[in-house]
Structure formats: structure tokens, C-alpha cells
Amino acid sequence: MKSAINNFIFLFCACMIFIACGTKKGNIVFDSNNGGLFLPDGFGAVVVVDSIGPSRHIAVKENGDIYVKLKITSDAPGSVALRDEDGDGKADIIQPFGKYVNDGIFATGMRIHNGYLYYSTEKVVYRQKIDNDLVPISKQEIVLMDESDQWHIAKPIAFDKEGNMYVPYSAPSNACASFINTTGTSVQQAGQYPCPELVNHAGIWKFKANAINQTQKDGVQMGTGLRSIVAMNFNASNNTLYAVQHGRDDLHLLWPNHYSAWQNAVTPAEEFFEIKEGNHYGWPYTYYDPITRQKMQAPEYSGDGKTIANDQSIVNPLIAFPAHWAPNDLLFYQGDQFPARYKNGAFIAFHGSTNRGPYPQAGYIVAFVPFKNGKPSGTWEVFADGFAGVDTIVNVSDAQFRPMGLAEGPDGSLYISDSRKGKI
């Protein structure tokens, strides 16, 4: 997840007028090239802000103010607030704020809930009461403290209608391997069974949104068997939690006798799940093959790339996206500005792959999935493309921009943050 500076692409229907900051109105003039993006007919894009620093998730207040969680590698403010004062869709005020302990490169969460701004560093979920001021001035409260220190430590945040907050504790490993067995040039791992990481990791926990100073033991585990979750949200139409998983890596590197380099590039799928308490979604024992459309036994657990998983209790995905695309945010569209088919549908920001070599990298898009009655009602499609700025991405460093976070504005506009350069 490399990033250098940050972008906000502001998307909205071409026939609409944008209304921001309460009573202030202004006609939006779309960028002539839609900010470098390729969009469906009838949509336009405006660049909102430039060079605010590498960003993660974003949130938009009811008056149009924008809040961004930054990826911090130095002693600098960890968030930034933006305000459009003349209704042209571009930020006129850019105000960094907040210094937090243990911020770090995987600081991620930024959401607004019941009058509070919630945001997360790598190990802490904070909140502050927000009012008419652009930058929160209220006391900062610790909602949740993570006492562990591990890989996959990002903490996205989601809320339901009953006063609960959801935070993932992702897996600290690739496949829950217990030891390494080296034979010649082949390095193979044996998986632990049962996997001890499933006790306190590889799942999503439910907490009270209004409680302070919680730790993991105050929460209730929802789903398990989820390797790494950054894209997670509630669908308000059915009050159900959904998540898109980062699948495992290194099938060819660790198991070259079972998987070719090409199989490694296209397997396993990034899986889109409906999250239910008590469900097991497969990691580390299985993975989903997007070619065969089946759950397969993981090689660390006696799989060979051909053995179908026989545990019927493991839940299949609603949709299987291409391998290694790195789903980093999920938004269910609630507005009325976009055409009716987008209502309650899912937008997913794919950050883009890093490990498909020797084949080109892929992803770097925002996808859309139509929904009806809480289930996908059609195939997924590319909504926004062109972030990478090049036709062939040999290495992740070739990509000019990488879509990262999603937020919906009060008028139904869609905001997209980029984790590299800060174009708007």
C-alpha cells in the first residue's frame, strides 16, 4: 500500500447542480478530462484538493465538510479537514489537525456517526464531537484500544442502527503457518490446525459505539475466517454488515509444485461477504478459486490446487473479484442524485495489486455492484477507471494514483480518495 500524496475525486451526475455548505450554491464545472478518469455516460468529475498528503478513508459531514485520515510517516498532523466555501466543488480551506500516538502507515478509519467524528490509528479508535467548526475542538476520547502489535493492523470502522460499532482484527499472517519446511529451492509452510489466530484475529468484532476505553475483550466476535479486512460497511437498506476480503498471497512462491506463476496471479479471489455472527468464511483452511468458482483446500492444509474444500460450514462469497486487487473501502449508495439503479448498490475501491508479477498488476478501479433486497442483483462492473494513468502497470510504482477511500456527500455525490499524489 505505497502512497505519496492524496487525491479526492468528486463524482456526480452531469445534469445536477451541486449544493454545499448549507445555503451556498454553485454550478459545478466538470474538469474537461474528468480528472483523468473514465466514467459511465452522464457522470462528471471535479478535482477537489491537491497535495494534502497520503490518504486513507474519508468522511463527509451534512454541510459538505470533508474529513480525511492521513497515512503518517513523520511527526505531522494525522487528519485534514476541507471546506468548499463557494460551491464550486473545490476545497477553499484545507486545515490539517490532530496528532495521535501510534498513527502509522496503516492508520485508516474515518467515519461520522451520531454527531461524532470517529477515526483510527493503527491501534486506537478515537472520536470527537463535531459542530459548526471545521476542525473539531472537543475533547478527544479513546473508544477502542488494540493491545496487540501485528501485520494487517488497519482498523476501518462501521456502524449499525442499534448503536454498535464494528472493527476488524485481521490475521497477523498469510496462512497461519507453524513452521517452514525447506526442500532444495522450494520453501513450503505447514498450517496450524486448529489455527490459533482465529481466537483473537481474522474476524470482525462488535462494540458499543458510545462506550469509552474499550478493548477487544469488551467486544463480541461476528464472522471469523477473514484474513484481512479494510473494505467494510453497513447496508442501511437491510441493516446488514458486509466486507470485502484481501485474499492470501504467495501460492507459487511457497508451493511451486502445485501453482504456476499464472495461477498465482489470478488466484485466490478477493471475496465479497455478507457478515453474520457465527459464520466461518474460510481462512486459513480454504480459499476461493475465481476460475473454478469453488472453495479450494489451502496448500498448507493438504491442498494441491485441485482439491475442493469439503467443509460445508464455510461460507461462499456473494461475489468473487479478481485476485490481489486489494479492496480498501466499501460504500452502499443512499443518495438520489445517481440513476435509480445505483440506489443501495455497493461501490468498492480497489487499491490495486502489488504481487501479480511477472504478469502486469491489475485493479486500480472503483467497481459497482447493483443490489436488491440485500443481495447482488447483477454482475459487478467498472464504475471509475484511469487512476493508474498508464495502460500497463508492470510495477505498483507505475500507477499515478490509487483509489483508497469512499464517501457520499449530502447531495449524493461520491468522493474518492487516492493514496499517492493528491490530484483533485
Name the predicted role of every residue range.
Residues 65-69, 116-119, 164-168, 240-244, ...:
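Conserved beta-propeller blade signature
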Residues 58, 110, 157, 229-232, ...:
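Hydrophobic core register within WD40 beta-propeller blades
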Residues 46-71, 326-332, 347-349:
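Beta-strand-rich domains and repeat architectures in extracellular enzymes and scaffolds
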